[in-house]
Amino acid sequence: MTMIRTRFAPSPTGYLHIGGARTALYSWLHTRRHGGRFVLRIEDTDRERSTPEAVNAILEGMAWLGLDYDEGPFYQTERYDRYRQHLQTLLDAGQAYYCYCTKDRLERLRTEQQARKEKPRYDGRCRDLDGPPSEEVADEPVIRFRTPLEGHVVVEDAIRGKVQFLNSELDDLVIARGDGSPTYNFTVVVDDLEMGVTDVIRGDDHLNNTPRQIHLYQALGFEPPRFAHVPMILGEDGKRLSKRHGSVSVLQYRDEGYLPEALLNYLVRLGWSHGDQEVFGVDELIQLFDINEVNHSASTFNPSKLQWLNQQHIMRAEPNHIARHLGPFLAERGVDPAEGPALEAVVRTQQERAKTLVEMADNSLFFYRRPEAYEEKAARKNFKEGTAEILEHCQHCFSGLPSWDAESIHGVVTEAAEAFDVKMGKVAQPLRVAVSGSAVSPPIDATLELLGREETVARVGQAAEWVRQNVG
RNA sequence: GUCCCCAUCGUCUAGCUGGCCUAGGACACCACCCUUUCAAGGUGGCGACACGGGUUCGAAUCCCGUUGGGGACGCCA
C-alpha cells in the first residue's frame, strides 16, 4: 500500500475562494487521516491573470485556516522543461500532432456547429497531415492530443462510482499553445504524475475533464490516480457560489469575525456528515472524515448556519484562544487591551453573547473606553426620577467596599434594591447604562468587577450628575 | 444543442444493504419557561421524501420515464 499523496492546486487569479477552501479541506483531512503527504501546487500557466498578490492571498488563507502543506508550493511556470519533455515524448510517439488551424477558422467551425445544434468540437483537420496545409495557416501551430476515436473510457470515482464517457464525445484537445506553453489538462496530468499524487480530490466541474486526462496518463505510460469529484457549493439562487452571493473569500470571513475552526466545521458539513453531529473540532475531523461518505448533490451556502457554528466554537473555546483572535479587532478600533481589564477575562464574560468576533469587539469597547453618550432609548427608559439617588447610593457603597469582587458588588445591588424598595432591575439596569452606555452587557456584578472600582465609581457619579441635569 | 452529474422540511442533513419511517436531528422562524439586561440553556410548535408509472405482500429506499437543478463543450484553470 503506497503512501497517500494528495494536492491542492489553486490558480492564483484571485483570493482563496470558499469553494477552493472546501476542496483543500477535504484533501487535507483525507491526507491527515491516512498519514499521507499534502502537496501545494500553484497553477499559474495563465500568465495574464496570475498575480503575486493572488498567490499571497491564497497562502495567507491557507495559513489562517491551518491547512498546512508538506511539500511545495510548486509553481507550474517553473516546470516548463518538464512539460516540454513530455510533449516531445507524445509527438515522437505520434500521440500528439501540430495543428495549424487559425483562431478564425476554429471560431467559424464552432459557430457553424452550434447553428446545426451540434456539440462544438474540433473537426480533426490537421490530425493526419504531414506538414502545414495549403491555406488558412496559423503563424504558430498549437499541439493537440490524438484522442481515440472509438470505444469509451470509465472514470472510477470514490463518490460517484463508475462514470462512462464515449470517446466519440471527446475531441483532440490543445495541450500546448503556439508559444509552446502547455495548457491546463496537460500540466495537471504531468504534475500529478511527477509529484506522485495518488488521490485527486477536486470539484465535480472537473469530472468532464477526467476522461481526457485518463487518456493522457495512459499515453504517457502511467496508471491514473484515484479520483473523488466533490459536489459544488451553490449560492442562494442555485448557481455556483460567486461574489453576487456575498462573501466568497476565506479572508473576508476572517475579517468579519469568524474563527478558522468554525469555517472549517461549516465547510466540512456542507457535503459530508457523521450521523446528526454538527459541531466538530479539527482533530476530531481528522479521525472521522471519510471521503467515501461525501454526498453526491450540491449544497447551498447558508450564512445563518455558519454564524451559529461560529457561536458554538466561540463558546467552547479557551478564552486565551479567543483573546488572541479578538486582539486585532480591538486594535482596529483604536483600543489597547493593556490599558484596561485583562482581555481573557473580558472574553470569559462575553463568550456566550457574541456570534462573531466583530460583535464581541463592539460589545467590549466600553471596558476600555468611557462611553461618550448614553443610548437615547436606554437612558430614557432607565434614567428616571429617583435614579440619581440610587446611583449615588451605590456609588457611595462601592467606594466603601472592603474588596472589589462580583460577590460584594452583587451585595450592594441587592441591598440598594431593598433600601429603595424596588426590584433588582431598577438598580441593575441604571448601573448598566451608566457604565456601558447601553442596556446590554454581561451580568452587572461581573461587568463592574472587570471595570474596576475607580472607573466604576467615576462613571456612576457622572451618570448621576447627568440624570440630575437631564431628568425631571 | 450534445454529453456528464444530481433531486428528503426555507437551508444543512440522518435514513438508500426494501419492513424498524404516522421520515429523525441541526440551523432559521414562532411560542412558553428560566432570568435585572443581552445572550446562553430548557420545553413545545411550524415544516420534506419533485411528479408519474413499474417491481413487490410492502418503496424515501430498487427499475423506467418525465420535470426541475448543476456542470462541461476556452489556445482559462
UniProtKB/Swiss-Prot annotation:
This protein's UniProt keywords: Aminoacyl-tRNA synthetase, ATP-binding, Cytoplasm, Ligase, Metal-binding, Nucleotide-binding, Protein biosynthesis, Zinc
Binding residues for Zn(2+): 99, 101, 126, 128
Cofactor(s) this protein requires: Zn(2+)
TM helices/strands, residue ranges: none
GO cellular component, one term: cytosol
Name of the protein described by the UniProt record: Glutamate--tRNA ligase 2
Compartments in which it is found: Cytoplasm
GO biological processes: glutamyl-tRNA aminoacylation
Pfam families to which the protein is assigned, alphabetical: Anticodon_2, tRNA-synt_1c
Family per similarity comment: Belongs to the class-I aminoacyl-tRNA synthetase family. Glutamate--tRNA ligase type 1 subfamily.
Motif 'HIGH' region mapped to chain: 10-20
UniProt biased composition (Basic and acidic residues): 112-130
GO molecular function: ATP binding; glutamate-tRNA ligase activity; tRNA binding; zinc ion binding
Record's subunit section: Monomer.
Region listing for Disordered, in residue ranges: 112-137
Gene3D superfamilies: 1.10.10.350, HUPs
Disulfide links within the chain: none
Summary of the function given for this chain in its UniProt record: Catalyzes the attachment of glutamate to tRNA(Glu) in a two-step reaction: glutamate is first activated by ATP to form Glu-AMP and then transferred to the acceptor end of tRNA(Glu).
Note on how the cofactor is bound: Binds 1 zinc ion per subunit.
Residues annotated as binding ATP: 243
EC number: 6.1.1.17
Domain of life: Bacteria
KW Zinc (keyword) present: yes
